[in-house]
Amino acid sequence: MTNSNLRTENHFDYVKISIASPQRIMDWGQRTLPNGQVVGEVTKPETINYRTLKPEMDGLFCEKIFGPSKDWECHCGKYKRVRHRGIVCERCGVEVTESRVRRHRMGYIKLAAPVSHVWYLKGIPSYVAILLDIPLRDVEQIVYFNCYVVLDVGDHKDLKYKQLLTEDEWLEIEDEIYAEDSTIENEPFVGIGAEALKQLLEDLDLNQIAEELREEITNSKGQKRAKLIKRIRVIDNFIATNAKPEWMVLDAIPVIPPDLRPMVQLDGGRFATSDLNDLYRRVINRNNRLARLQEILAPEIIVRNEKRMLQEAVDALIDNGRRGRTVVGANNRALKSLSDIIEGKQGRFRQNLLGKRVDYSGRSVIVVGPKLKMHQCGLPKEMAIELFQPFVIHRLIRQNIVNNIKAAKKLIQKADDEVMQVLQEVIEGHPILLNRAPTLHRLGIQAFEPKLVGGRAIQLHPLVCPAFNADFDGDQMAVHVPLALEAQTEARMLMLASNNILSPATGEPIVTPSQDMVLGSYYLTALQPNFKKPNFGDNQRTYASLEDVIFAFEDKRVGLHEWVWLRFNGEVDDDEESKTPQETKELEDGSKLEIWNFRRDRFDSQNNLISRFILTTVGRVVMNHTIIDSVSKT
């Protein structure tokens, strides 16, 4: 940690998530004010006073615990303005500071009875069950007050350590222990609820168990061995992180900062509040009721029922619906617990931390762009003008079209031809990155040269779809603009779609035609047996070049699958042809005509080729012309 220019910067090597000890949970929420007063414990379920609309003291929005709700102003209003910074009001006990501290200052609730953490109890796998080597069903029976568990067998011969007993079984054993003729001196000790679970976890000697398990593994096979390995893996993790198993049972629960679970006043005077406040309120109410019952020495059955209800309230706060009935609010909607806020696609990690929106990026639906080159993509004008706006503004000012940024922005909003011309110049040679989620391999994000198109959809060449695993049934893709010259160079040299033809995983081509392209190629080159082949010399069906055939097709003088004779002096590759011509004719001028199945070759007396006519279809001519045209351009 270094201190420079009065700013403290933290340099981390890594972030680690581990179980928090009860003391650490208290430390998160407990603070000593400048006047020496210790605050942090939330003891009241109230949120705000309905008359004054100010937070209640020691409640879920308490200003003494979490900080003032207005900048530099205490609860009672005695101290206002920044000049009183750091002073603790002697009347209300609120520290005069910025209100933004309410975004990170935490509190805690001291529980009247230990409570099991639902993640470790009901998670898959259940770490509590694995550590104790007790089936999960039995652990739940203990935690939710259905069965007793033997913590100490004493002198009783029929009992075993960690054995489960029902209410009736324990009453029978009690009668046996306290009978007049009883010989039991050391009484067995049983427990129930999370307290018993905590006792069992405290009794574990992890190092000794690890040694015993390692010896047992050497002589075990099959399913038993797999179970032992699973258990030793959990134990080793506890040892490596210096975490104690009993920390899976909570003595205190943290209360997250109030600005992360806000309460907002609506127009009609009503309040909208975060679900967490309702869940915290349930916990505090039940905790306070349990503490009161313990104080007045209420019957055990009532106290036990209250402890079970406290356990269920904490379960709902941490992970609502994981066990038992889901807690619902108004309109029978399930309340969002801490787990719901963290997990899933809309959770804190994926939505806010990993999936942040970045500048110079956009998103739209993709449609097929068959007329594009492989390294090109169609970028909607509306999107391009927004993404490249700083570049366009710079060029407009440099070309003296406008004098300042404000005028440039006004001109851009009109989107006239002048702006579009400048935009065209800007995007010329400036690659953009296209990304399709999920990005499972490096070809999930590739660079393309943008081409301005109308509409609001991004056009994508069909050949690059396999790399993105994209199709055109409503898929969306993200656009990013590389800004630095180095980033643009890297995008052009390494990430351009035409440079990523082979799969990095297998080395095989990933750019392969499929679906429409294969079907189209087949239809174009298919031979129709029903069409009559013209005789050689038929002037209606004889053409001097590929272009002449295409012109005739465009004029609708010939159909796509009709046979034609075409003069073509290039090499012809035909698997169906035999090695020798069907017939050879000597012509009057001394030349020679070779008659093949699908071609007629004419040679002079020195055996030089004079002309070659091939019998083919219009579709095959179109296909060959397209290939020759594209190859000659590259």
Curated annotation (Swiss-Prot):
Coiled coil: none annotated. Binds 1 Mg(2+) ion per subunit. Mg(2+) binds at residues 471, 473, 475. InterPro entries: DNA-dir_RpoC1_gamma (IPR012755), DNA-dir_RpoC_beta_prime (IPR045867), RNA_pol_asu (IPR000722), RNA_pol_N (IPR006592), RNA_pol_Rpb1_1 (IPR007080), RNA_pol_Rpb1_3 (IPR007066), RNA_pol_Rpb1_3_sf (IPR042102), RNA_pol_Rpb1_clamp_domain (IPR044893). GO terms for molecular function: DNA binding; DNA-directed RNA polymerase activity; magnesium ion binding; zinc ion binding. GO terms for cellular component: DNA-directed RNA polymerase complex. Keywords: DNA-directed RNA polymerase, Magnesium, Metal-binding, Nucleotidyltransferase, Transcription, Transferase, Zinc. Zn(2+) binds at residues 74, 76, 89, 92. It is an enzyme of class 2 (transferase). It catalyses: RNA(n) + a ribonucleoside 5'-triphosphate = RNA(n+1) + diphosphate. The keyword Membrane does not apply. Pfam families: RNA_pol_Rpb1_1, RNA_pol_Rpb1_2, RNA_pol_Rpb1_3. Signal peptide: none annotated. Its cofactor is Mg(2+); Zn(2+). In cyanobacteria the RNAP catalytic core is composed of 2 alpha, 1 beta, 1 beta', 1 gamma and 1 omega subunit. When a sigma factor is associated with the core the holoenzyme is formed, which can initiate transcription. Belongs to the RNA polymerase beta' chain family. RpoC1 subfamily. NCBIfam families: PRK02625.1, rpoC1_cyan. This is DNA-directed RNA polymerase subunit gamma. It comes from Prochlorococcus marinus (strain MIT 9515). The gene is rpoC1.
